[in-house]
């Protein structure tokens, strides 16, 4: 895994790359990109995996002008130009799925196939009720029960983290609040743009996801012209982390089905 810092539009963007072959742009969720996670190896075995840390996450800088998820999509589009790619497959997890849909509405021809894993980004329910539980108001123990199929196995022990890792965790959470607090976890304009997405799209959800419900996912998928949904068993909001083998198999099968 290669790590670099790339300067784009005033952002010092942390960038991870691995493998060779058809390119995949991987857009991480609120926890950031962790190159040691087991799903990374199968994705990069036959593909070129390009995984930036969003501005304000990991070790990427966050200039003052970036104050919305929509802004991040433009940064990643410029990244694709910088690395010389006209078209990529895109995988987006949670808020990374939101970034991915924003990106796909702005440059439909740049996205060959799209995978959205427990994505947020749209409002599908009544205006007076949250579609996604308020993660900023929940105690950590309650949040972990919503995030994971098996919280006891997946919960991080903070005493085993380095000071740098703890600082990144705190920074990731602060950036998430800045970008997704108001309006909460959605862009009111995005549903009116999703008809522009031309890529075949796979919506993935862990069966025990307590943040993104099956109803929300289905309603989200109906907003795109060519989308379908699948469920990964024994997984919560991050199936790529809880069930990396099943996740990689499902995603690669979908991507390979469209290979020329």
Segment roles from a protein language model:
Residues 125-130, 140-198:
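Conserved alpha/beta-hydrolase catalytic His-Asp/Glu region
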Residues 197, 203-205:
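Short beta-strand/loop motif that positions the catalytic acidic residue
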Residues 208-212:
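Acidic catalytic loop of the alpha/beta-hydrolase fold
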Residues 227-260:
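Catalytic active-site module of serine/aspartate enzymes centered on a nucleophile-bearing elbow/loop
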């Amino acid at each position: 895994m290669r790590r670099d810092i790339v300067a784009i539009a005033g952002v010092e963007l942390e960038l991870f790359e691995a493998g060779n072959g058809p390119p995949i742009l991987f857009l991480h969720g609120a926890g950031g990109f962790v190159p040691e996670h087991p799903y990374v190896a199968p994705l990069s075995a036959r593909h070129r995996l390009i995984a930036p840390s969003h501005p304000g996450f990991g070790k990427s800088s966050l200039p003052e002008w970036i104050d919305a998820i929509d802004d991040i999509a433009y940064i990643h589009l410029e990244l694709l130009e910088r690395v010389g790619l006209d078209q990529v497959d895109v995988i987006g997890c949670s808020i990374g799925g939101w970034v991915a849909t924003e990106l796909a509405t702005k440059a439909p021809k740049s996205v060959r196939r799209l995978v959205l894993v427990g994505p947020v980004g749209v409002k599908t329910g009544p205006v007076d009720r949250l579609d996604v539980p308020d993660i900023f108001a929940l105690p950590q123990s309650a949040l972990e029960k919503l995030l994971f199929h098996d919280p006891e196995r997946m919960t991080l022990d903070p005493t085993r983290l380095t000071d740098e890792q703890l600082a990144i965790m705190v920074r990731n959470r602060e950036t998430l609040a800045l970008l997704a607090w108001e309006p909460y976890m959605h862009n009111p304009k995005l549903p009116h743009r999703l008809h522009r997405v031309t890529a075949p799209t796979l919506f993935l959800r862990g069966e025990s996801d307590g943040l993104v419900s099956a109803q929300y996912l289905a309603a989200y998928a109906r907003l795109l012209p060519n989308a379908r949904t699948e469920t990964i068993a024994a997984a919560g909001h991050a199936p790529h982390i809880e069930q990396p083998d099943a996740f990689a198999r499902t995603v690669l099968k979908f991507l390979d089905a469209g290979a020329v």
